[in-house]
């Protein structure tokens, strides 16, 4: 089971509208979602209980128990979850967790669904409403799944912990584990939304668009879930998106030092208290790290020369040269050191 990547911002609300209509047709029999208000009370209790139990195991750092209660495919490749439990145990231990109303997803059919889309709750003429949600999961085997989201508050940064659960016999077994901070560089989604709007008002659309993207990431506990709030932010981000940035799979060229750089991605990245901007570009070979460093540095300077507004919004710039094989070489320069 893979979690789907996000749709392009401009597409989301449009496909929601026709997907609502499509739900009335044959595909509704393949993918059905029940929100907490719609599901049987015993099912809701079971999902909430499983979420609390797995959170307690996570707080104790009991990866062995979590693995024991996982579905076979997850247990067979458990290293990622084990690492996530270890990384977040200190934040979970002694913290208070509140379970949000869960969701029940039913996928029917004889084989895995290449792209399963679940519409949960009530939708209006314009798409999502206050209590609705959409989940998009790739390669999902037929079965009953629960989504239990916990808000975790302790001495550290607020977090969410999301469990995807699969009904197996009398158990709701672990099928996915997603721990996520509710803040980036010490700020929550509301802070990034306000600053994005401020940048937009100053016609700094590159900063606005990148801050909207961070706000969207912080507004949903998992990337394969969207809500009315994230849909509205996608619309705002689309309105601010500049034409000269790589987005939606489209590369953009930037000239620096007589070389043409094919930029493939640009995105914000929080590292500790710093908030950086990362730019990736195509490279034939990164084995010569001295040359790669020089080219990364030249690109960083050219990027700031073209978009000086980035200095107002970020603590540093990361350039990553990426080979066709996926191997890359990155360089981070603090903003104050870039002349």
Which sequence ranges carry the predicted segments?
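Short solvent-exposed beta->alpha transition segments
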Residues: 33-42, 48-49, 64-131, 216-246, ...
């Amino acid at each position: 089971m893979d979690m789907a990547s996000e749709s392009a911002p401009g597409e989301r609300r449009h496909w929601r509208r026709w997907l609502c209509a499509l739900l009335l047709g044959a595909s509704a029999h393949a993918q059905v979602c029940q929100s907490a208000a719609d599901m049987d009370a015993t099912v809701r209790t079971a999902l909430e209980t499983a979420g609390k139990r797995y959170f307690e195991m996570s707080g104790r750092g009991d990866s062995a128990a979590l693995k024991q209660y996982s579905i076979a495919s997850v247990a067979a490749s458990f290293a990622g979850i084990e690492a996530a439990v270890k990384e977040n145990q200190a934040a979970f231990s002694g913290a208070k967790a509140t379970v949000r109303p869960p969701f029940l997803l039913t996928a029917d059919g004889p084989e895995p669904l290449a792209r399963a889309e679940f519409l949960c709750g009530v939708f209006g003429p314009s798409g999502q409403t206050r209590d609705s949600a959409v989940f998009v999961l790739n390669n999902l085997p037929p079965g009953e799944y629960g989504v239990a989201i916990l808000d975790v508050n302790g001495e550290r940064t607020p977090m969410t912990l999301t469990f995807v659960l699969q009904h197996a016999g009398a158990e709701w077994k672990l099928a996915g584990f997603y721990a996520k901070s509710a803040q980036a560089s010490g700020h929550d989604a509301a802070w990034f939304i306000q600053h994005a709007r401020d940048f937009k008002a100053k016609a700094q659309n590159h900063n606005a668009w990148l801050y909207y993207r961070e706000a969207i990431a912080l507004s949903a506990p998992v990337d394969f879930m969207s809500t009315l709030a994230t849909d509205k932010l996608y619309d705002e981000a689309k309105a601010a998106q500049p034409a000269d940035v790589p987005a939606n799979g489209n590369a953009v060229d930037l000239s620096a030092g007589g070389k043409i750089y094919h930029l493939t991605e640009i995105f914000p990245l929080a590292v500790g208290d710093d908030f950086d901007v990362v730019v990736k570009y195509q490279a034939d070979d990164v084995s010569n790290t001295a040359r790669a460093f020089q080219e990364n540095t030249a690109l960083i300077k050219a990027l700031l020369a073209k978009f000086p507004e980035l200095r107002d919004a970020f603590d540093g710039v990361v350039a990553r040269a990426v080979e066709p094989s996926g191997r890359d070489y990155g360089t981070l320069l603090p903003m104050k050191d870039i002349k």
